[in-house]
Amino acid sequence: MLYFENDYCEGAHPAILQKLTETNFEKVSGYGTDPYCASAREKIRAACACPEADVQFISGGTQSNAIVIASMLQRWQGVVAAATGHVAGHEAGAIEYTGHKVITLPQHNGKLDAAELRELVATFYADDNHDHMVFPGMVYISHPTEYGTLYTKAELEEIGRAHV
C-alpha cells in the first residue's frame, strides 16, 4: 500500500543514499551556501525561465506552505482547502498562526470540487456582510492528495476558473 501522509514517513531512494555516501566526507559550507545548493538554484532558475530569481531553500513543507500563504494573502484573506488538505489539519495551526484562516470544503477522495468552490465564492460575495468576513483569497491544492489521488488538468483548470 502507498501512503502519502508526508515525506518523513519513508526512507530515501537508493540513488539519493548513494549520492549521500559519495559526498558524505566533503567539507562544504552550510546553510545554503554550498555548491550543491548553488547548482540547484541555477537548475530551478532555468526551469522557471527566471535567471534573476532569488531562490531560497526551506527546511520542510509546513514552513514552505506557511511562508507562501502568508506572503501571497492580504491580512483579511484566507486559504480554501479540502477538509483533508495538508494545510487544514496536518500542519498543526501553522497557517492560522500567520493570521490566515483555512476555509475548508468537503473532500472527494482528497480533491476539491470546482462546483463547491464556485458556490463558496458566490455565497461569500452574495452576503451583504462579506466585508466583515474572511475573504477566500487563495486555493490550496495537494497533488497528490492525502489519499494519493491526482487532479486532472481539466479539474485544475475548472478550479482555477471557479475561484476568479
Feature locations, PLM:
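N-terminal amphipathic/basic leader segments beginning at the initiator methionine
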Residues: 1-19
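Conserved core of the PLP fold type I
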Residues: 52-73, 103-110
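PLP-dependent aminotransferase-class I/II
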Residues: 99-146, 150-155
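Conserved small/polar residues in nucleotide/adenosyl-binding loops
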Residues: 162-164
